[in-house]
């Protein structure tokens, strides 16, 4: 078996990587051990920056129908460490800042896009060995037909917290041991009103409950007194009922429970997200206590950061430095999530001192000048990428908000759907930069338009992931393009179906 890229792990993050790569015309194979999508309740929250980034690549349900209508900024209520009052706001023209979708639904959506773009999805296939070679990676695979070898140019490990890819490649991690015990499951309560929906804090721990459309209750418990001694022991319905009743301080009768799992605050951050021709994304790269709905969003942003870079490298339009930037950009973002989830967990522990801190934080959340920073941290809207060019301008690395072009139907979200780097030239002042970019014309999407009221620059280079790659005031445009894409002279593009149903590029 041969491919240009193998993605090991077919959860939502792995499937999104595959959809991105295949959309660029990269021969991609997904190797997934599970034979079908798991319906076990997992993550359901995507935060603003992940939602905005998916919109720019055409992945939102309805192909972007959730985008703002121009009526102004939109806001959604959230929490910090179970303290309500946090408001997350998205700019005008962007999707709603919080998207609720079951993880299984997203996995199916991304798999459908990956298959439609030409990716091979092989379920029931387990990777048993990995060897990096000078010009590629060799994988030993066990599948329904027996053992097989797979040779690829690059490897992406999206195989979760117990990543085989990470372990086989010997990538070290910074870890913190578990200090709390938690359970999750779908319970059938004998009295559906016995548990109030939402967050319940008692001196004995936490219960978070939410009723499902089918009448079951998704229950999570948190005990801050210590970690489970037998992490591998499968929890039972009786154990879940006992823990819920203990924390609630009264008997909570259950007629049954299923999909019961243990989890904790065990933390892992891989010391590098890249080694040679292999990359880590999602839980394979970073793991934290699941508070604040940030895990899935972080993995989505990993995938959208890596996809276009790896596709360009496969096609010879980018070099090692661009591939290295994946680790330089995403590892600090993952560390920030690990740190803020640890801070939130500290605020969830019992005790009078913590009670006082929670009261203080509740007051801060009521003040916009303090709450805005927390909201931007949780939603990743405050993130700015590290400088990439030699002399960065003040706009480089910032995520460019959506806007509509003058006298035209297109907006930024629409222009980025085909996955090409976008060069925006505003008015006559912007047009003077076109000649400087001519050597990269086959790679770029160049859009000449009128001046945008309030725009800070006459030209902008926007990366496929929505971040500003260059603006006047720093390095010259040619230097920025050379840093990202080499010295130009790329072969002409051939249009292919993009993940969002628009047009993508194949560099061949």
Feature map (PLM): residue ranges:
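FAD/FMN-dependent oxidoreductases across multiple families
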Residues: 233-295, 340, 383
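Conserved FAD-binding catalytic core of PHBH/FMO-like flavoproteins
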Residues: 112, 154, 158-265
């Amino acid at each position: 078996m041969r491919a240009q890229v193998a993605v090991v792990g077919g959860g939502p993050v792995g499937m999104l990587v595959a959809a991105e790569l295949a959309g660029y015309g990269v021969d991609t194979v997904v190797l997934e051990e599970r034979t079908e999508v798991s319906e076990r309740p997992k993550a359901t929250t995507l935060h603003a920056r992940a939602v905005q980034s998916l919109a720019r690549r055409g992945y939102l349900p309805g192909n972007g129908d959730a985008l703002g209508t121009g009526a102004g900024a939109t806001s959604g209520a959230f929490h910090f460490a179970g303290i309500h009052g946090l408001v997350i706001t998205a700019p005008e023209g962007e999707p709603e800042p919080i998207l609720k979708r079951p993880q299984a639904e997203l996995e199916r959506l991304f798999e459908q896009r990956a298959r439609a773009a030409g990716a091979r999805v092989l379920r029931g296939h387990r990777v048993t060995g990995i060897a990096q070679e000078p010009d590629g990676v060799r994988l030993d695979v066990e599948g329904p037909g027996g053992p097989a070898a797979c040779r690829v140019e690059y490897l992406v490990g999206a195989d979760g917290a117990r990543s085989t890819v990470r372990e086989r490649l010997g990538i070290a991690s910074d870890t913190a041991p578990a200090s709390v015990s938690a359970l999750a499951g779908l319970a059938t309560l004998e009295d559906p009103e016995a548990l109030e929906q939402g967050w319940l804090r008692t001196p004995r721990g936490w219960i978070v409950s939410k009723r499902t459309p089918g009448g079951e209750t998704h229950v999570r418990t948190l005990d801050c007194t210590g970690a489970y001694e037998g992490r591998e022991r499968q929890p039972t319905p009786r154990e879940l009922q006992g823990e819920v009743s203990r924390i609630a301080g009264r008997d909570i009768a259950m007629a049954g429970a299923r999909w019961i799992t243990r989890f904790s605050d065990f933390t892992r951050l891989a010391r590098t997200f890249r080694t040679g021709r292999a990359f880590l994304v999602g839980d394979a790269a970073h793991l934290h206590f699941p508070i604040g709905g940030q895990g899935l969003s972080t993995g989505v942003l990993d995938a959208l950061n890596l996809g276009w870079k790896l596709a360009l490298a496969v096609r010879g339009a980018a070099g090692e430095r661009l591939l290295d930037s994946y680790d330089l950009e995403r590892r600090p973002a993952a560390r920030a999530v690990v740190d803020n989830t640890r801070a939130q967990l500290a605020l969830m522990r019992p005790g009078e001192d913590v009670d006082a801190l929670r009261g203080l934080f509740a007051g801060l959340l009521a003040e916009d000048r303090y709450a805005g920073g927390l909201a931007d941290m949780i939603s990743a809207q405050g993130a700015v990428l590290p400088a990439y060019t030699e002399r960065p301008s003040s706009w480089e690395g910032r995520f460019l908000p959506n806007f509509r072009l003058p006298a035209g139907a297109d907006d930024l979200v629409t222009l980025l759907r085909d996955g090409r780097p976008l060069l925006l030239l505003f008015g006559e002042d912007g047009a003077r930069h076109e000649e400087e970019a001519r050597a990269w014309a086959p790679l770029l999407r160049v859009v000449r338009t009128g001046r945008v009221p309030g725009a800070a620059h006459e030209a902008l280079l926007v990366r496929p992931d929505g971040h500003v790659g260059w603006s006047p005031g720093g390095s010259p445009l040619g230097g920025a393009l050379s840093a990202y894409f080499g010295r130009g002279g790329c072969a002409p593009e051939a249009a292919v179906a993009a993940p969002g149903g628009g047009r993508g590029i194949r560099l061949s």
